[in-house]
Amino acid sequence: MTSSSVRVRFCPSPTGIPHVGMVRTALFNWAYARHTGGTFVFRIEDTDAARDSEESYLALLDALRWLGLDWDEGPEVDGPYGPYRQSQRTEIYHDVVAKLLTAGEAYYAFSTPEEVEARHIAAGRNPKLGYDNFDRQLTDSQRAAYLAEGRKPVVRLRMPDTDLAWHDLVRGPTTFAAGSVPDFALTRATGDPLYTLVNPCDDALMKITHVLRGEDLLPSTPRQIALYQALMRIGIAERVPEFAHLPTVLGEGTKKLSKRDPQSNLFAHRDRGFIPEGLLNYLALLGWAIADDHDLFSLDEMVAAFDVADVNSNPARFDQKKADAINAEHIRMLDVADFTARLRAYLDTHGHQLALDDAAFAVAAELVQTRIVVLEDAWALLKFLNDDRYAIDPKAAAKELGPDAGPVLDAAIAALDGAADWTTADIEAALKTALIEGMALKPRKAFGPIRVAATGTTVSPPLFESLELLGRERSLGRLRSARDQVGSP
């Protein structure tokens, strides 16, 4: 097989909100396809009408587009093996089941769960062992009798009486002993196809060569290999694909990261202001590393280096602090104009308005770019520029606006009122002359009260630049208002 013939797939079910573990799987598949020059197939497994939703389907499209994980075949792109939504492929599955039955690879099974348990008990076995392959040996007359009773059979695959083994690209040689996996259902009693059928069936028909998926699906692999082998014998499949079972993503402690964990929600990270580059870099580290001493890399660098054989099989813990730190680095790496545009879009999306024209906003953005972890942090630093959101934090006032702040504010107001021009340089010169030289104050004592009076907090962008952005009138108005409150109960 040439590398360009590699075909991988990402095939989520449209239920709930996209999960970071799911996105990690999509990323590894996408990166492997791009690294090999192969094809990335996006397929929707929407055969569970009770749980699937159009809202979740659209959320999946939104997630992949936001992250920049483009697909070569799939919804809204199409391709030679469509349709790419399983709900639109029902007739294909019925045809495959019919061929499996005709070839003797599958059979109708009428046993109820209660009957299976009763047979296990009668034989002295654990009643929870699962299906016992009883219906394999039914005669035509027995099947006819069951049908006459009104029973609706499921269709089961006839499992081979040999070990099922494969070389997992992540976990190495893996074997399930003969007889350890019973004949499994391919359809419901209604005739509707089950995941156990449609997933391998679609992989075969779409000529998937490599299956990269979560470790939680490892137990289903022997069943799927058996089905691939049956599909090969009836001329539907060309091969059994290579398998790579990716390590579990853990949350707190040793528990698997679940949908109930806040950090599992992809859109929660986007809402906080993660940028795609930062989040993808961190998710790539959940099982893979570009180098032992190198955690920061671009998507292009990942594509150039990624080989699924290098993925570690050990569970990977989602560390929010490390994710934040990596995102902060990627924000710093952005071109200033790019960062400015992204910050503007983020603030607009979240209803955060600043009274700044484009030029002033660009200045403000550059001031905060190296001071934030996520885009959300920028609003906390810049909201003082919005009069409706400006307020002096009581803790900041208690720290910086005590009685001894009065003379400092008086001197600052006088100095700024006399500044010829309202530029950062003029503001800095006026305040340093009045407070550092004139009053012999240390910078913290000199500028702390001014920062709190102007921005409402002890943490802000650089003070002199902040005052220039705020403007002469608003800056002096806030300083005077704060001076009036100094020393009051």
From Swiss-Prot:
Span(s) of short sequence motif 'HIGH' region: 12-22
Protein name: Glutamate--tRNA ligase
Lineage: Bacteria, Bacillati, Actinomycetota, Actinomycetes, Mycobacteriales
SUPFAM superfamilies hit by this protein: An anticodon-binding domain of class I aminoacyl-tRNA synthetases, Nucleotidylyl transferase
Enzyme class: ligase
Keyword Nucleotide-binding in record: yes
Alphabetical list of InterPro entries matching this protein: aa-tRNA-synth_I_cd-bd (IPR045462), aa-tRNA-synth_I_codon-bd_sub2 (IPR020751), aa_tRNA-synth_I_cd-bd_sf (IPR008925), Glu-tRNA-ligase_bac/mito (IPR004527), Glu-tRNA-synth_I_codon-bd_sub1 (IPR020752), Glu/Gln-tRNA-synth (IPR000924), Glu/Gln-tRNA-synth_Ib_cat-dom (IPR020058), Glu_tRNA_lig_a-bdl (IPR020061)
One Gene Ontology MF term: ATP binding
Keywords: Aminoacyl-tRNA synthetase, ATP-binding, Cytoplasm, Ligase, Nucleotide-binding, Protein biosynthesis
Family, similarity comment: Belongs to the class-I aminoacyl-tRNA synthetase family. Glutamate--tRNA ligase type 1 subfamily.
Entry's EC annotation: 6.1.1.17
Gene3D superfamilies given in the database record: 1.10.10.350, Glutamate-tRNA synthetase, class I, anticodon-binding domain 1, Glutamyl-trna Synthetase, Domain 2, Glutamyl-tRNA Synthetase, Domain 3, HUPs
Residues in coiled coil: none
Subunit structure as annotated in this protein's UniProt entry: Monomer.
Matches recorded under CDD domains: GluRS_core
Localization terms from the record: Cytoplasm
